[in-house]
Amino acid sequence: MADMSLTIITPERTVLRDAPADAVVVPVVDGSMGILKNHAPMVANLRIGVLRYKQDGVYKRVAVTGGFVEVSENRITVLADAAELAESIDVMRAMEAKRRAEARLRDRKANIDRTRAEAALRRAMVRLRAAGALDHDKD
């Protein structure tokens, strides 16, 4: 039986609502933070990364792109700019987005917005990590 519940909401939709969770690891601006039962109440800024939550002994992944996490009374609420469950990620589309961003960053002659291209690359990499399509599991 899970000790906590996890809700993930974006401006467009609710990704998870009261999902049972035994543990949650969220990507925060200064690293990753683990949340277990009876965690102290808190609010933190999220960074682009992979949120992991343990359910029935298995960690599940969600790609998140910024926002906030709130912990209160064994309820974890994530308000994310965008979020995508690992099983919903179109890996081919994410790989293509990664390839396009890398190509834009390599092209020194092109007049591109490097900040946007770097952000696009980070988002694509996070989606691929969440989907398990990369060799490593770092946030």
Curated annotation (Swiss-Prot):
GO MF annotation, one: ATP binding
Protein name in the entry: ATP synthase epsilon chain
Keywords carried by this UniProt record: ATP synthesis, Cell membrane, CF(1), Hydrogen ion transport, Ion transport, Membrane, Transport
Domain of life: Bacteria
The keyword Chloroplast belongs to this UniProt entry's keyword annotation: no
Family: Belongs to the ATPase epsilon chain family.
Membrane association type: Peripheral membrane protein
Complexes and interactors: F-type ATPases have 2 components, CF(1) - the catalytic core - and CF(0) - the membrane proton channel. CF(1) has five subunits: alpha(3), beta(3), gamma(1), delta(1), epsilon(1). CF(0) has three main subunits: a, b and c.
Organism: Symbiobacterium thermophilum (strain DSM 24528 / JCM 14929 / IAM 14863 / T)
